[in-house]
Amino acid sequence: MEKFKLLKLGKPATLLLEDGTVFRGKSFSNPQTVTGEIVFNTGMTGYQEIFTDPSYNEQLVVLTYPEIGNTGTNLDDYESLKIQAKGIILKNLSNAYSNFRAMRSLLSFLKRHKVVEIHDIDTRALVLHIRNNKTMLAVISNETYNLTFKEAKATIKYGKHTLNSNLASRVSTSLDYYQWMQPLNRKLKFGYSIIRSFNSAINKKLHTSKKLRIIVLDLGVKFNILRYLKSFECEVIIVNYKSTYQQVMKFHPDGIVISNGPGDPAKINRVVVRVNKFINKKIPILGICLGHQILARCFEAKTFKLKFGHRGLNHPVGINKRMEITSQNHGFAVNFEFLKSNKFYANHLNLNDGTLAGISSQNFPLISVQYHPEGSPGPHDSNYLFKYWVYIIYKSKSS
C-alpha cells in the first residue's frame, strides 16, 4: 500500500458544457483538454468499477456523492483492463484512504491511467443542470482556465463525430477469441452461495459434470458478468463483436451472451443481423444492457435516447408486485410497441420512469434485461438471473 499525502488545491481547471455553461474547478492531472458526453452516476460507492466499466467509453462521468476516493483502489474491482471514462468530475477528491483491500489512492490510479479529473465542482448544481436540460457534450481543460466556447468549438465538433460512431469497436476485444478463467472471489461471498447450491443440485439431478460452453459476444463486457458465468462451472469464451455466425458456431455454444457496452444500438446494425441467426437457431441467449437493446432490435423494436439516462446503483425495477433494486448504466431504452406483435413478455419495468427493463419470449429461449444483474458496483437482488438463464440452457438441452 502506498503512503498518502495531503493534497493541495491543485491547478485551475474549467468544465465547459455544449450549451455554453461554465464551471470552474481544480485539477491534479497532467495538462490536457478532453471532450465527451457528460453523464452522472448517483452511486455512493463503487467508483473504481464505474470508471473501468466499458459502457462509459467516451463519456465524462460526474459522481454525485460529494466525497470520493476514501476507500482507495485495489486489484479486485476492475471491470475492464483500464479506465474507460474520458474524464472524471468530482466535488471532493480524497487522497487519504482506508480499506483492507486498498493498494493505491484514487488520484494515483487516475494518473497511472492518464485520465483527467476536475474537482471542487458544484456537482449538485451541475447534475440539476443536466437533468433539467439533457446530457450533452462537454470539455474538461486544465490547460486553459479561461477556456471559451469559441476555443472549444473544434473539440466539441470532434466529440460529436466520435459519439455518433460505433463505440463497440473501441472496447471489444482485439483478439478473435479468448477463454475466461476467473470465477467470483469466494472471500467476498457476494452471489457465491446461490451458485454453489445450484451447481450441486444440477449435477445431482442430471448426473453430469459436463460444463456448458458459453460464448460472450463482446460489445464491452464487464468482468463481473464473466466471473458469474465462470462460477456456474461454465466454459466461457469471449469473441470479438465482429465475429461471424460461422466463427461463433464452430465453438458449438450451449448459450450466447450479448454483452453490455457503450453507445447507440442503432450504430451497430450489423451485429443485429448476426444475432438474428443465433435466434433462429434457437440457441439460448442472454442480453444485458446494450445486449438487451440489440435483441429487441432483432425483432424490429425501436430504441430511443433518454434525456439523461439511468446511471446509478439503486434503480427499482419490477412488475406484478415484485420489485428489485438494480445497478444501471445506459442512455438508450427500448420502445414497448414491438412486444405484442412478437409475442414477448415484459418481465420488468423501470419504476422511476416506466421504461422497459426486461423481456422474455414465448417462442425463443431468450431473456434480456436493461439493468446489470452482476452488480459491481451495486446490489445483488438480480443475480438470480444468471442461475435462471443457466437453468433455461439445461432445460433446452434436455428437451
UniProtKB/Swiss-Prot annotation:
Keyword list, A-Z: Amino-acid biosynthesis, Arginine biosynthesis, ATP-binding, Chloroplast, Glutamine amidotransferase, Ligase, Nucleotide-binding, Plastid, Pyrimidine biosynthesis
Glutamine amidotransferase type-1 domain ranges (all copies): 213-399
Documented EC number(s): 6.3.5.5
CPSase: annotated segments: 1-209
Record SUPFAM superfamilies: Carbamoyl phosphate synthetase, small subunit N-terminal domain, Class I glutamine amidotransferase-like
Gene Ontology MF terms: ATP binding; carbamoyl-phosphate synthase (glutamine-hydrolyzing) activity; glutaminase activity
Stored NCBIfam families: CPSaseIIsmall, PRK12838.1
UniProt similarity note: Belongs to the CarA family.
Protein name stated in the entry: Carbamoyl phosphate synthase small chain
Organism listed in the record: Cyanidium caldarium
